[in-house]
UniProtKB/Swiss-Prot annotation:
Keywords: ATP-binding, Kinase, Nucleotide biosynthesis, Nucleotide-binding, Transferase. One of its GO terms (biological process) is dTDP biosynthetic process. Its EC number is 2.7.4.9. This is Thymidylate kinase. It catalyses: dTMP + ATP = dTDP + ADP. One of its GO terms (cellular component) is cytosol. InterPro entries: P-loop_NTPase (IPR027417), Thymidylate_kin-like_dom (IPR039430), Thymidylate_kin_CS (IPR018095), Thymidylate_kinase (IPR018094). Belongs to the thymidylate kinase family.
Length: 226
């Protein structure tokens, strides 16, 4: 059995630019008549947003960090993601479980088996009534060299949060964690070259969705498809 909705996650290190492309894809789906739910992790519900504020500001060890993230995720799954998928929505989520394995696992060096146990507990508790676990059908991984990401963040106007303020070496480990996840799930995770200019990144995203048959190709004024 399959869910009526479609679940797409956006992943990448801080500074890769993924968040700025979520609304663009939402608009593309809406233009084709699809209902879209846009959300983020950690966050997406009143409770999860409170946990997000703690995670971004307060110092804590890797286990505490992981437990708070999975607590926020369970509430998010139950309150937002699963109801939206059951309605038939396209769910676009800025970060999901891959972030946890990349940041807390590879970045912090936290035990992957413990993360896997927490993942199973969280996802099984929020499983859809047909038994399907809430894993994205597609993950768009914005791959960018940590050094370039650091340059981009240095030019940002806002004050960096606790994760954004980590040293480049931390993000190198996180990037390797993402690469390992992509190698283990090549059909689900599509690499996006985030070093490209913005319009080329948008084209990569659209191409990935057209390839899946989820978006129609864009027709140019000359009558060709893109």
């Amino acid at each position: 059995m399959s869910r009526p909705g479609l679940f797409i996650s956006f992943e990448g290190i801080d500074g890769a630019g993924k968040s700025s492309h979520v609304e663009g894809l939402a608009a593309a789906f809406r233009a084709q008549g699809r209902r879209v739910t846009v959300s983020r992790e950690p966050g997406g519900t009143p409770l999860a947003e409170k946990l997000r504020a703690l995670l971004l500001a307060e110092r804590m060890d890797a286990l505490t960090e992981s437990l708070l993230i999975f607590a926020a995720r369970r509430d998010h799954l139950r309150q937002v993601i699963e109801p939206a998928l059951a309605r038939g929505d396209v769910v676009l989520c800025d970060r999901f479980t891959d972030s946890t394995f990349a940041y807390q696992g590879a970045g912090r060096g936290f035990d992957h088996e413990t993360l896997s146990i927490l993942e199973r507990m969280t996802n099984t508790a929020a499983a859809h009534k047909d038994g399907l676990l809430p894993e994205p059908e597609l993950t768009l991984w914005f791959d960018l060299a940590p050094e370039l990401a650091a340059e981009r963040m240095a030019g940002a106007a806002h004050r960096p949060d606790r994760f954004e303020a980590q040293p480049v070496e931390f993000f190198r480990r996180v990037a390797r964690g993402y690469a390992d996840r992509a190698a283990a799930a090549p059909r689900r995770i599509v690499r996006i070259d985030a070093a490209q200019e913005c319009h080329r990144v948008r084209q990569q995203l659209r191409d990935a969705l057209v390839c899946k048959g989820w978006l129609a190709p864009m027709v140019t004024p000359q009558g060709g498809a893109q």
